[in-house]
Regions:
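Cationic, low-complexity basic patches in intrinsically disordered or flexible, solvent-exposed regions
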Residues: 6
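A feature for loop-to-transmembrane-helix boundaries and adjacent hydrophobic helices
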Residues: 9-294
Length: 294
């Protein structure tokens, strides 16, 4: 039986210390059982995204059941594939500590996210082709849900210390007090840092709101997906300015890091998609006008 002494509940403190508020990597504690903040918020983001994509699928004319199957398949492939890579890279350590396998789902790293995203895109492409789904309409339906999911994931990252920010001397800075934040994510304990994850989360919520408003009013298929790619790339690129770069890869004499390179690619792909769709619409309008003149 659980007692008040054996149950801990952790959330960001609303009270500010001299410079910052504290955040914690453990959301719930039931005796020796820990519920990590990152895993709980990421799961909430997945659930919210799955529920939302059922509604957006109807708006774009895609079967909600097909969209559900596509989403679940992509999530499974992304998680399983990235964890297999993690096991392969750390096989010698995991052989000595097999119990660590239970915590692999909670590990967060930009490389794992990139591998998971690539695998998910591949799985989604195969599924849409197999099910004869329109890829542009499917991408439009998925975009707002992905933005919502990323927002919750970033809130979880804030609480756990994953992707922590650079040292800051601002009233809204956060400080990690739990040693688990350092052990799990490498976050500095006792140092006030930028809550860069909240910057991202707020931006993603704003993107999702705009896309949901725009979705039923879009002029052509693919507009929402293209806009999401451009906006997401811009958010990632600029928020990396306040994110600690340890373990994120750097090129051009530390001018850019790995996520910023990925962000540039997202913007380019999104811009190409929007330009291609716009060019096609203009071409169609010219053909129609020419036929009318005849």
């Amino acid at each position: 039986m659980l007692t008040a002494q054996r149950v801990g509940f952790y959330l960001p403190s609303c009270a500010l210390s001299s410079y910052s508020s504290q955040v914690y990597p453990v959301l719930f504690r039931f005796g020796s059982l820990l519920i990590p903040s990152y895993g709980a918020l990421a799961a909430l983001g997945v659930l919210t995204g799955l529920l939302l994509v059922q509604r957006t699928a109807r708006v774009v004319g895609v079967s909600p059941q097909q969209m559900w199957n596509l989403s679940v398949l992509s999530l499974f492939v992304a998680l399983a594939g990235s964890r297999v890579l993690l096991i392969a890279v750390n096989w010698s350590l995991l052989r000595m500590h097999p119990g660590w396998l239970l915590g692999l789902a909670m590990v967060h790293h930009p490389l794992l996210a990139a591998v998971g995203a690539a695998l998910a895109i591949g799985a989604a492409a195969c599924f849409t082709r197999w099910q004869h789904m329109r890829w542009d309409a499917t991408a439009d339906a998925a975009a707002p849900a992905l933005a919502i999911g990323f927002a919750f994931e970033q809130i979880g990252a804030l609480l756990s210390g994953a992707g922590f920010g650079t040292p800051a001397n601002v009233p809204w800075a956060v400080t990690y007090a739990d040693p688990l934040a350092e052990r799990w994510s490498g976050a500095p304990v006792g140092v006030a840092v930028h809550p860069v994850q909240i910057y991202c989360a707020l931006a993603y919520f704003a993107i999702a709101s705009v896309l949901l408003y725009w979705l039923p009013r879009r002029q052509q298929q693919g507009d929402i997906a293209g806009a999401w790619l451009v906006a997401t790339g811009a958010v990632v690129f600029f928020t990396e300015i306040w994110r600690d770069r340890v373990g994120r890869g750097e090129i051009f004499e530390k001018f850019l890091d790995g996520p910023q390179i990925a962000a540039i690619l997202l913007v380019l792909v999104g811009a190409y998609l929007l330009r291609r769709r716009t060019a096609a619409a203009i071409s169609g309008a010219v053909v129609i006008a020419g036929a009318g003149n005849e």
